[in-house]
Amino acid sequence: MRVMDKLVIKGGNTLHGKVDINGAKNAAVAIIPSAIMASEGICTIDNISDIEDVNCLERIIKSLGCDVSCSSDAIIIDSTKLNSYNANTEDVRKMRASYYLIGALLGRFKKARVELPGGCPIGARPIDQHIKGFEALGAEVTIDHGVIYVEADRLIGTNIFFDVVSVGATINVMLAATLAEGTTVLENVAKEPHIVDVANFLNSMGADIKGAGTDIIRISGVKKLTGCSYSVIPDQIEAGTYMIATAACGGEVIVNNVIPKHLESISAKLIEMGAEVEENGDSVLVRCKGNLKGVNVKTLPYPGFPTDVQQPMSSLLCISQGDSIVNESIWENRFKHVDELSKMGANIKAKGRTAYIKGVEKLQGSVVKATDLRAGAALVIAGLVAEGVTEILDIEHIDRGYPHIEDKFKKLGADIKRVTI
């Protein structure tokens, strides 16, 4: 029988102290599949978070023939014995980022067979732009009974203009193009920090990628990739979550091991609401002493406000003064936290891609469910500020992206514990 945990939170404490941010989940789950493209040498990747998505990928690449070992915050991958292009385990179906195996295996073997992935249920998350890119490089793509088959005699560099800005497609096609013949030019690409991180990792293995983080990425194909040592960037989303939690609870917290530039859109909103945010090297201090005012938020591709922080921000807006409007422009079904927040007394209603919020003075503790990763983070923040006790169920979603969340908040003064059901 599977062991299930829940989080039990007694709200009302202010937060004080320091919190260290781990390596970026969104970077790690793309870099680990990228590592299997190395036909020589060993990849040592550090600043890796102890989260379920990383553990899941470790099991997947082992099933493909890689030798994998882990230390406290590093993963060592020897993919020289990679012997399968067929990724069809239960773990593949469990997580969205397993689709990066398609681009990686296509680059390495010129073929891939991958179960269509899962992850958080936040609406239709099509891979049509991935397929467009693979086909443009010369691959034939078929989907049958939940399995995607991709195969090419040769991958030939070309110009690809994505119809929509897609983080996943940008990375996946970049992976395949790295080992293609000739030059590939990707336009209308996503610019998120973890895309730059993946490109830097590939370049460390011997790739020739220029322009990641700009409007156009140029990839000159190489014949092989070689293992390297690399450190993953800090997690922008984890950092933003702790910043928002501090603003919600009040107090003063230094968020360490961050790249402040990656947090500018979050910092700007918190300052607009009345919180204080100070940058200092690789840390950000958040201070909040009084009531915050509601603001309007629209999620946008980087450098805009991150969709992954929309749900935690919604919890903060629920206890801010006045009205707020949250427009989710990236995903069409990312408001599953709304019903759970309503159980806690929030005045929040969702219609289409927009949530309308009227701030209330207090939230009340309740029993709620984490329907997805970032909704779970939103409920933790709501529980931290609510009167009474909040129990959060289905926290396996939270464990996919937030390492030791209860320990980190406890060190900041929160009354939070993990309980086995």
From Swiss-Prot:
Pathway: Cell wall biogenesis; peptidoglycan biosynthesis. The keyword Cell division applies. Its EC number is 2.5.1.7. One of its GO terms (cellular component) is cytoplasm. Its main location: cytoplasm. Phosphoenolpyruvate binds at K25, N26. InterPro entries: Enolpyruvate_Tfrase_dom, Enolpyruvate_Tfrase_sf, MurA_subfamily, RNA3'P_cycl/enolpyr_Trfase_a/b, UDP_GlcNAc_COvinyl_MurA. One of its GO terms (biological process) is peptidoglycan biosynthetic process. The modification 2-(S-cysteinyl)pyruvic acid O-phosphothioketal is found at C120. Belongs to the EPSP synthase family. MurA subfamily. This is UDP-N-acetylglucosamine 1-carboxyvinyltransferase 1. The gene is murA1.
